């Protein structure tokens, strides 16, 4: 019987993974550990592996997988910047991802957290906790229908986000290297700077790559409309975090919502209750009154989790049986 290791198992995923194994006549072993130099030897007797990495995979894992006859790694996220695709290819390892698992879920999250900032929820909550129930200009907002929203990246998630904002009646500008002709209700601009210059809300939906690394830094923030709101439910490396904090502090941004952080791997998805966090930048984000931080959780719905579990396992089995899969990256 074919054997697949399901690394990075959350409690709520275990039953889904085992049920998939029964339906597909595959022996699935679940483990809460991640694939790494320390765990790769567990795969000696396996045919395939799926995992949910957050940090960079060590280079010595690829040749070890090859030596064990394993031909793939099925990543259970859309992002894949934790892998060296060229090195994997050199060792005959197919890397795959799950590019679409519930774009609407992430879009809904992106809009809902933006609305918290639009309607000044953090400020209102602090006032109420202090028993200040007055109405003041500082917590007055304006309707989204009178706003311009910039969507940076109009793939599946960005497109879904744009459609929600369109339902509010917002004016929508966008930038994408490959414009979506079906999104005829928005206006594409020739650059990110052009797309954001008049935007009240900026919503990021781009992958992590060389072109997007620290795309939003001090130089980019200099082109932002004063008082804009920035939402990042894409990848942490898209933002230069210290520059973001400066932009909020100096009033360039009214606020920001951050679901991804470039140094999140050690912290996000882990319980750090009653532990010391050494990352001073992360602490500054968390403690900032006008920055909302969530732990890479925008995708987290029952539909998305089911699709990620099955998407990873389906890709692993496809490579085992045919040598490739539809979501292959290298």
From Swiss-Prot:
<dbReference type="GO" id="GO:0008720">
    <property type="term" value="F:D-lactate dehydrogenase activity"/>
</dbReference>
<feature type="binding site">
    <location>
        <begin position="156"/>
        <end position="157"/>
    </location>
    <ligand>
        <name>NAD(+)</name>
    </ligand>
</feature>
<dbReference type="Pfam" id="PF00389">
    <property type="entry name" value="2-Hacid_dh"/>
</dbReference>
<keyword id="KW-0560">Oxidoreductase</keyword>
<dbReference type="InterPro" id="IPR006140">
    <property type="entry name" value="D-isomer_DH_NAD-bd"/>
</dbReference>
<dbReference type="InterPro" id="IPR036291">
    <property type="entry name" value="NAD(P)-bd_dom_sf"/>
</dbReference>
<dbReference type="InterPro" id="IPR029753">
    <property type="entry name" value="D-isomer_DH_CS"/>
</dbReference>
<feature type="binding site">
    <location>
        <position position="259"/>
    </location>
    <ligand>
        <name>NAD(+)</name>
    </ligand>
</feature>
<feature type="binding site">
    <location>
        <begin position="206"/>
        <end position="207"/>
    </location>
    <ligand>
        <name>NAD(+)</name>
    </ligand>
</feature>
<dbReference type="InterPro" id="IPR029752">
    <property type="entry name" value="D-isomer_DH_CS1"/>
</dbReference>
<feature type="binding site">
    <location>
        <begin position="233"/>
        <end position="235"/>
    </location>
    <ligand>
        <name>NAD(+)</name>
    </ligand>
</feature>
<comment type="similarity">
    <text>Belongs to the D-isomer specific 2-hydroxyacid dehydrogenase family.</text>
</comment>
<feature type="active site">
    <location>
        <position position="264"/>
    </location>
</feature>
<dbReference type="Pfam" id="PF02826">
    <property type="entry name" value="2-Hacid_dh_C"/>
</dbReference>
<dbReference type="GO" id="GO:0051287">
    <property type="term" value="F:NAD binding"/>
</dbReference>
<feature type="active site" description="Proton donor">
    <location>
        <position position="296"/>
    </location>
</feature>
<feature type="binding site">
    <location>
        <position position="176"/>
    </location>
    <ligand>
        <name>NAD(+)</name>
    </ligand>
</feature>
<dbReference type="InterPro" id="IPR006139">
    <property type="entry name" value="D-isomer_2_OHA_DH_cat_dom"/>
</dbReference>
<feature type="active site">
    <location>
        <position position="235"/>
    </location>
</feature>
<protein>
    <recommendedName>
        <fullName>D-lactate dehydrogenase</fullName>
        <ecNumber>1.1.1.28</ecNumber>
    </recommendedName>
</protein>
<keyword id="KW-0520">NAD</keyword>
């Amino acid at each position: 019987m074919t054997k697949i290791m399901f690394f990075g198992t959350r409690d709520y995923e275990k039953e889904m993974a085992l049920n998939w194994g029964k339906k597909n006549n595959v022996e699935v072993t679940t483990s809460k550990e991640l694939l790494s130099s320390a765990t790769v030897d567990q795969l000696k007797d396996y045919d395939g592996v799926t995992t949910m990495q957050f940090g960079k995979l060590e280079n010595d894992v690829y040749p070890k997988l090859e030596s064990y006859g394993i031909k793939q790694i099925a990543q259970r996220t859309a992002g894949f910047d934790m892998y060296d695709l060229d090195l994997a290819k050199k060792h005959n390892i197919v890397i795959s991802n799950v590019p679409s698992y519930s774009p609407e879920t992430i879009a809904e999250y992106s809009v809902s957290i933006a609305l918290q900032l639009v309607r000044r929820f953090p400020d209102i909550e602090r006032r109420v906790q202090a028993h200040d129930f007055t109405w003041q200009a500082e917590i007055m907002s304006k309707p989204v229908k009178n706003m311009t929203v910039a969507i940076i990246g109009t793939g599946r998630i960005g497109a879904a986000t744009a459609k929600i904002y369109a339902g509010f009646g917002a004016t929508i500008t966008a930038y994408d290297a490959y414009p979506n002709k079906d999104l005829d209700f928005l206006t594409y601009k020739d650059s990110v700077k052009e797309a954001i210059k008049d935007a009240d809300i900026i919503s990021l939906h781009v992958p992590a790559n060389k072109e997007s690394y620290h795309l939003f830094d001090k130089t980019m923030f200099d082109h932002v409309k004063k008082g804009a709101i920035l939402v990042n439910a894409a990848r942490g490396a898209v933002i230069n975090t210290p520059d973001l904090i400066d932009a909020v502090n100096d009033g360039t941004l009214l606020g920001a919502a951050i679901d991804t952080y470039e140094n999140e791997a050690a912290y996000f998805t882990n319980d750090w209750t009653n532990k010391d966090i050494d990352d001073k930048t992360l602490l500054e984000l968390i403690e900032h009154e006008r920055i909302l931080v969530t732990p890479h959780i925008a995708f987290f719905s029952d539909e998305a989790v089911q699709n990620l579990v099955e998407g990873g396992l389906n890709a692993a089995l496809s490579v085992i049986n045919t040598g490739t899969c539809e979501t292959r990256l290298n």
